[in-house]
Each structure stands twice: as structure tokens, then as C-alpha cells.
Amino acid sequence: MEVTDVRLRRVNTEGRMRAIASITLDGEFVVHDIRVIDGNNGLFVAMPSKRTPDGEFRDIAHPINSNHRGKIQDAVLAEYHRLGEVEVEFEEAGAS
């Protein structure tokens, strides 16, 4: 499995979310709503999730091993940093 495309939009929020990404896997499968989060130990990628009735978050889609998680994170963060080198217009979180 290879990440063949990354589409990313930065968001301007009060919280720790810095961007929302969509990735294409092997040119055939797209995963939307991947979040770039500024955590205590630096940036990381959070897979799309939804809140359960008991208030916890559960991933909707996620890699099943750390090797593939690393590939996704590396590709998304590389695009995030690449966009950081050019002037970007921020979107307000939740804007369509």
C-alpha cells in the first residue's frame, strides 16, 4: 500500500488541530478527514473518527500495523511542511 496523493487544507482554530487531509491509497481508495494535530510531542496524524454514545472517540478507518501508519503519517506531514513553505490562506474550522 502506497500513499499516492495527499490533499491538505490548513485550518485556523483555537485548539490543536492544524490541518485536515485526504489521502489516496494506490490510486484507488480515498480516506477523508485525517487531522494533523499539534500534540505535546510535536505534530501527529489522527485518523478519521466519530464519538461513541459514551463520549469516547473510535477510528472509522485506520491502518492495522505501525509500518502503514508511519507511511500515512510521513506523507501527510511532508505535505503539511511543504505547504508551510508557501503562503497559505487559512480556513476557519468547520467551513465548507
UniProtKB/Swiss-Prot annotation:
Write out the entry's keywords from A to Z.
Cell cycle, Cell division, Septation, Sporulation
InterPro entries named in the record: SpoVG (IPR007170), SpoVG_sf (IPR036751)
What biological-process terms (Gene Ontology) are attached? division septum assembly; sporulation resulting in formation of a cellular spore
Keyword Mitochondrion present in the record's keywords: the answer is no
Coiled-coil intervals: none
- Pfam families assigned: SpoVG
Which family is this sequence assigned to?
A: Belongs to the SpoVG family.
Reported function: Essential for sporulation. Interferes with or is a negative regulator of the pathway leading to asymmetric septation.
Q: Which PANTHER family match?
A: SEPTATION PROTEIN SPOVG-RELATED
NCBIfam families membership = PRK13259.1
Q: What is this protein called?
A: Putative septation protein SpoVG
Name the species this protein comes from: Priestia megaterium (Bacillus megaterium)
